[in-house]
Amino acid sequence: TPKTIGQDIDADNEQIKNGQGYDHNYVLNKKEEGELSFAAKIKDPVSCRTMEVYTTEPGLQMYTGNFLAGISGQHGATFPRRSAVCFEAQKFPDTPNHPYFPSCRLKPGDTYTQKTIYKFGVEK
């Protein structure tokens, strides 16, 4: 269900409190391992810019810049806490310790391939 990113960012939830915002891995609904499928969409309500994420990975980490406070950027810009959001397609955290998670193990000679597409647009 769509909602604003900030809606629950200060929720009374242990994981949100520990991370001081979102730093969560979401399990993506896949029909089969390695399937390229939709993962997430964000939209800026002011500019109407959108970003959609498609990936072959089983998980999507969302991080809301919870520790950016005062980080300096280009041209003298300063980034305050929570002034960014990241969508990182990846395997599940702690995968090697959970045999029922999709494997992330690579043996010598193995090739690892994944695809992530970030699609930008404008939507009224």
Residue ranges and their predicted role:
Residues 1-124:
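Active-site pocket scaffolds in enzymes
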